[in-house]
A protein has these predicted regions:
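Acidic/glycine-rich phosphate/pyrophosphate-binding loops and surrounding catalytic core
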Residues: 68-125
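Compact, glycine-rich, soluble single-domain proteins
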Residues: 1-81
Length: 125
């Protein structure tokens, strides 16, 4: 999706967000549901990410993700419906409800809505 030099990357790792600058020590981390941000020429760009791995090397970051969507690619209405459905599942009294799955769906929908709201990010963000 992005194959160009960036000044900084913020990765949604399994144990929290990881900031990566050029020259970072090598590592591999598992991705969680979250917002990936990166800066090019003073402009911030955002992706909604879910599940996968990131390989960080001093001169390159490689992301292998199951889901990656740019802000402008996100269907906001679909994300709103997914959020409502997940909230209904979480408030359900049905003993067959998979609460962990509903929480993941809610988090993913919220991230998608947050990222979609950042379309056309301004310089310096």
């Amino acid at each position: 999706m992005v194959q160009e030099a960036v000044a900084e990357v913020q990765i949604p790792g399994k144990n929290g967000y990881l900031g990566v600058l050029p020259g970072h020590a090598p590592l591999i981390t598992e991705l969680s549901v979250g917002e990936l941000s990166y800066r090019i020429n003073g402009f911030s760009h955002y992706l909604a990410m879910a599940w996968g791995f990131a390989e960080v090397l001093p001169t390159r970051v490689t992301i292998l993700a199951e889901v990656a969507e740019r802000a402008e690619e996100i269907d906001v209405e679909r994300a709103r419906r997914a959020k409502e459905k997940a909230e209904q599942m979480l408030h359900s009294a049905d003993p067959d409800t998979d609460y962990e799955r509903a929480l993941e769906a809610l988090k993913r929908a919220e991230v998608r809505l947050d990222v979609a709201g950042k379309r056309g990010a301004a310089a310096g963000r």
